[in-house]
From Swiss-Prot:
Organism: Takifugu rubripes
Lineage: Eukaryota, Metazoa, Chordata, Craniata, Vertebrata
Gene3D superfamilies according to UniProt: Rhodopsin 7-helix transmembrane proteins (1.20.1070.10)
Residues holding 1D-myo-inositol 4-phosphate: 320, 346-347, 353, 404-406
This protein's name: 5-hydroxytryptamine receptor 1A-alpha
Family note: Belongs to the G-protein coupled receptor 1 family. 5-hydroxytryptamine receptor subfamily.
Amino acid sequence: MDLRATSSNDSNATSGYSDTAAVDWDEGENATGSGSLPDPELSYQIITSLFLGALILCSIFGNSCVVAAIALERSLQNVANYLIGSLAVTDLMVSVLVLPMAALYQVLNKWTLGQDICDLFIALDVLCCTSSILHLCAIALDRYWAITDPIDYVNKRTPRRAAVLISVTWLIGFSISIPPMLGWRSAEDRANPDACIISQDPGYTIYSTFGAFYIPLILMLVLYGRIFKAARFRIRKTVKKTEKAKASDMCLTLSPAVFHKRANGDAVSAEWKRGYKFKPSSPCANGAVRHGEEMESLEIIEVNSNSKTHLPLPNTPQSSSHENINEKTTGTRRKIALARERKTVKTLGIIMGTFIFCWLPFFIVALVLPFCAENCYMPEWLGAVINWLGYSNSLLNPIIYAYFNKDFQSAFKKILRCKFHRH
């Protein structure tokens, strides 16, 4: 999103955004006595062209692979991946429709395509970048519903619902990109024919920055925060259930014996006895008994004889080996749960960290600069870095949302090896 602002300190459209440190063209021509560029300027243009060209090509290639993978691999054709595919299409539009003109503007450090193309460029820039950001919100919202209401959302998670979310992102994008073309801009925006800048009207600045970034940012932080809490709760709950199930399943198979309570101390009848109070938690199948917390040992007297068989229970000293095994299993299970929590934190951290890293500097400058253009100064090279940092999010999105997915990785390998068979 190419938001630029003019400053009284620099009449050549010093921007907060993609204007770079440039050598004055007239001075360059006078210094050489010809129309040739001075060496530093030529070197800058070559290096910048190569770097930005590589960024654009990588972004086109990466997002194209995501779209192709979803289109060709049936296993990837689900609602969650439809949103990722739509994000890839949006970022592909940024890479094809916006970035080439932005790169030309960056390299030449002046706008050479006329005012009408400038208006179209700004509108496409704001539309596509805003839609890309809002797609991230749609993906976060879909994941939030899926993890907090998994049973009911299975039926609600339909292609139609995905289409509604995608349509909303584009409608909001249009509502932010169109107003400047309808007159919501200041007179100074077109004062310099060599500059192509977004509307610097204060009202539009607040409207566009909050609609395109700050509100989506808050929404994503809330959603991913709740997703993390829900995921952590589910992981820990699963571990507790598994441990409880393991403990309750520790039964003693006693099918050969029959239990009879002692009847008036009759030593001939079959009996079971214990040294302490016995509290079995619940009976097991096939004549087995689950041990209780106070259970020490179980003495079995066969029905047809007086021979006794003593079976140690899990919490007796004789069964310490069973306890050790159980403790090791529990410890391993908890380590796995902790690893899953860390992976969840890492994944959410990468998603939010990349988004904030790419766009927050841009929108801070976009919001502040129009209100203090006469008093604020920012080096042109820094404005260029901030501008292209935002654009680079279109390159990083397919890496974060698709390339880390094993199913996508498999599809990408098939595409690259040209051994793809739809199945």
